[in-house]
Amino acid sequence: TGVIMPPKGYLKRLREICTKHGILLIFDEVITGFGRLGSAFAAQEFDVIPDLITCAKGLTNGAIPMGAVLVQNHIYDDMMAAGKGAIELFHGYTYSGHPVAAAAGLATLEIYRSENLLHRAADLAGYWEEAAHSLRGCKHVKDVRNYGLVAGIELESMPDAPGKRAYEVFVRC
């Protein structure tokens, strides 16, 4: 159902545990990145520095498929040192080298900056929360959760037909 936010302090404690045991902390910010929680990334919102951040969608405003993995310097340095004459972070090539997607990404990031969209998103959070939570008490709405501009609306399942009610709502909307 998604949009289940961690309790206060949870991610900071997780960072401590990962650091203590040499475990990489990875944040999947495909949904939460690019201002949806009020900061560029959820990591900033929760004041945690992960080792890797995955992001997509918001990178090009969803106009063209593009994803990225942001890594801390120590990971990049280790990857670069892995092979003689390494000239790049070996990341796979299925979706690399697409100038149109790169141009869309650069244009999107410039619009985020020039129109102050990350901060404007934070300003809209209260309105979005009120709108999403207005669905509480509606027929078949089991739960409503949100943080910033991200919301999850959980619908009751139909007996013996999981997903059917959500599909019917999708078709009507």
What are these regions (language model features)?
Residues 1-173:
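Conserved N-terminal phosphate-binding loop of PLP-dependent enzymes in the Aspartate aminotransferase
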